[in-house]
Structures are given as structure tokens and as C-alpha cells.
């Protein structure tokens, strides 16, 4: 199968390596021709230091590499999905399968990544999402990893499963692309919050409370938007939440630690030196919760800290002093 991975960051590069290991004809596209040339020469991506790129992997800065591609992976940062989607649209056909692996919600429109791709490509082809607890640093050295391929058309989800699955990269399928993509976006917000806890010196009890109650908020919003409850307890939901909230591979968590230590959100993102998706997702998730009338006190608190400069200690006190309630009812997780 001819596959093109659009976006040469760590995640796009790691996925291109998986596809190469599976014997596909793979090209990794970079928006920066100079970077593409450097990677082709050194067989290394600076985002994955010490990892040699497969000799079979072609690397290009020319969009013409998309001609004839059967599988196209959209692996750009969430803020670049719309612009890049417009650029690749002319190369897609009804037979192409387009897979979003970006994690986020678009600012202002509050669209999921697959929705943006479907819109800017004129729904010319099927769009799936691939997501789960999967740090690029670990996938690139072939650590056992599991993800979920999601598409309302299960045949498409299974095609993606077949393309990626091997003895170190296990892929499950799902029809719930809403739940999978929403989980991918919100876990970055929660990882930021967990990092703040670390930066302030809070310990395991606090982070367990945060992660569990955040999952309740995700489930409430996700079901309201059409997601399936079971998705949020699976790899794309709880699995990705755990790995992002507990690992120093997570730039969202690293940014949160700096905020907890007293840095501003902008200072923290500058110091991390990479895209902190949770910063942008926090605003979008807050807007979605307001639009849908879903109570999400944790996500609202993260939004207030990031965008309005509210003191972390003040939001912690406010959250802990909320009105008493039962944890569960017959119909919902409160």
C-alpha cells in the first residue's frame, strides 16, 4: 500500500516507521523542504534523537508525493490541520483513506480534527482517527503499544487496523470517532492540570482525584456530543489519560509543572519549546461545555488559570469546597 504521512514531527515520524516495518511504500512529508532534506541525509529526526529512520522511508518536502497515495495520515499539530488539509485536498480521491492522528479541538469552531478534514476536503474520501496511549518516543523504539482506529464505517477502521497492526503496535477498532477524538483532546487538558499538581507539590492522592473526576467530566460531555460511554473507559479515553498525566514524555504535563511552580502559561509553553495542545484544547473544551450546558468544573478551572490568570490555589480551594453530592446515580457519573 502506498502511504504518505503528512507532518514530520515525532508522532508522524514514529507512525511512518510502523508502516515501513509493515512493508508499505511510505513517504514522510515535511512542510519544510530543508528539514526534509536534512532528515533524508542524516536518517534521523531531531524530535526522536538517536532513532535511525528506516532506509525504506522516503522523505519529501513536495506535496506531489501524495499522488496515488491510498492511505494518507494527517499528523500535523491541531492548529495546522485546516491549512494543511486544504493543501492535500487536491491529491485525494474517493478511494483514499485519510487518517487523523492529531489531538485537539479547533479554536472558535470547536470542530474535531476529522470534522475539519472532512470539511476542507469536501468529503471526497473516508476519514478515520487513530488514537490511544502512544508516546512517539516509545513507538519509535518498538515498545508494545495499543491504539484505537475509529470510523463510523467499520470497514475503513479495519483497513487502518490492518495497515498499522504488527507485533509491537496493536490496533483495536471502533465506530465511535466522536468519543475517540474528544478523549484525545481532553486528556491534554487534564495532563496540564496534573502537571500543575506536581509543580505545586501535590502528591498521588490529588492526582488520582483529578484524573478520576476529569474522566467523569469527559464522559458527561462525550455522551452529550454523541460518544459512547465505553469509549471513555478504553484505550483512547482512560488509557491515553493515564499515560499523558503520568509521563515526562508529555509536554502538556511538563508545561503544567512549570505553571504550578509559578510560571505564566506563556512562559511555560516557551520553556517547553514545543506545541502544548492542552492550552488550546482548554478553551475549546470550556466553550463546548458552555454550549452544551454540561457541568465541567475541573476543565473550567484549568481554563480560568490559563486564560484569566486565576491563582491555582484559589481554584483548588473552590473545587474542594463545592457542594456535597453522591458520586454515582443510576443514569450518570456525577
Show which residues each predicted segment covers:
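NAD(P)+-binding Rossmann beta1-loop-alpha1 motif at the extreme N-terminus of oxidoreductases
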Residues: 1-52, 58-61
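Rossmann-fold dinucleotide-binding core
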Residues: 105-203
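Ligand/cofactor pocket segment of small-molecule handling proteins
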Residues: 205-208, 212
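NAD(P)-dependent Rossmann-like dehydrogenase/reductase catalytic/cofactor-binding core
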Residues: 187, 194-198, 223-233, 237-334
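Rossmann-like NAD(P)(H) cofactor-binding subdomain of soluble oxidoreductases
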Residues: 53, 59-142, 160
Amino acid at each position: 500500500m502506498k502511504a504518505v504521512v503528512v507532518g514530520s514531527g515525532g508522532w508522524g515520524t514514529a507512525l511512518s516507521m510502523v508502516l515501513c516495518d509493515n512493508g508499505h511504500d511510505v513517504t514522510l512529508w515535511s512542510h519544510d523542504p530543508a528539514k526534509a532534506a536534512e532528515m533524508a541525509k542524516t536518517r534521523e529526526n531531531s524530535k526522536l534523537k538517536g532513532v535511525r529512520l528506516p532506509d525504506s522511508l522516503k522523505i519529501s518536502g513536495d506535496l506531489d508525493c501524495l499522488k496515488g497515495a491510498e492511505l494518507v495520515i494527517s499528523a500535523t499539530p491541531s492548529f495546522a490541520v485546516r491549512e494543511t488539509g486544504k493543501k492535500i485536498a487536491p491529491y485525494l480521491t474517493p478511494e483514499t483513506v485519510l487518517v487523523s492522528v492529531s489531538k485537539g479541538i479547533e479554536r472558535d469552531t470547536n470542530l474535531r480534527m476529522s470534522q475539519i478534514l472532512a470539511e476542507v476536503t469536501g468529503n471526497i474520501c473516508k476519514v478515520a482517527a487513530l488514537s490511544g496511549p502512544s508516546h512517539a518516543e516509545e513507538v519509535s523504539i518498538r515498545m508494545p503499544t495499543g491504539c484505537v482506529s475509529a470510523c463510523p464505517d467499520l470497514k475503513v477502521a479495519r483497513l487502518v487496523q490492518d495497515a498499522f497492526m504488527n507485533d509491537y503496535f496493536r490496533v483495536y477498532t471502533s465506530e465511535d470517532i466522536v468519543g475517540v477524538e474528544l478523549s484525545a483532546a481532553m486528556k491534554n487538558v487534564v495532563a496540564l492540570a496534573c502537571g500543575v499538581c506536581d509543580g505545586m507539590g501535590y502528591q498521588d492522592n490529588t492526582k488520582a482525584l483529578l484524573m478520576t473526576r476529569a474522566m467523569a467530566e469527559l464522559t458527561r460531555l462525550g455522551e452529550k456530543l454523541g460518544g459512547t460511554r465505553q469509549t471513555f473507559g478504553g484505550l483512547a479515553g482512560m488509557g491515553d489519560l493515564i499515560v499523558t498525566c503520568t509521563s515526562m514524555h508529555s509536554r502538556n504535563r511538563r508545561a503544567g509543572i512549570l505553571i504550578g511552580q509559578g510560571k505564566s502559561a506563556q512562559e511555560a509553553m516557551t520553556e517547553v519549546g514545543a506545541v502544548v495542545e492542552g492550552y488550546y484544547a482548554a478553551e475549546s473544551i470550556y466553550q463546548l461545555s458552555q454550549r452544551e450546558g454540561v457541568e465541567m468544573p475541573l476543565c473550567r478551572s484549568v481554563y480560568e488559570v490559563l486564560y484569566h490568570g486565576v491563582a491555582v490555589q484559589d481554584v483548588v480551594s473552590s473545587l474542594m469546597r463545592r457542594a456535597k453530592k453522591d458520586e454515582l446515580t443510576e443514569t450518570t457519573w456525577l
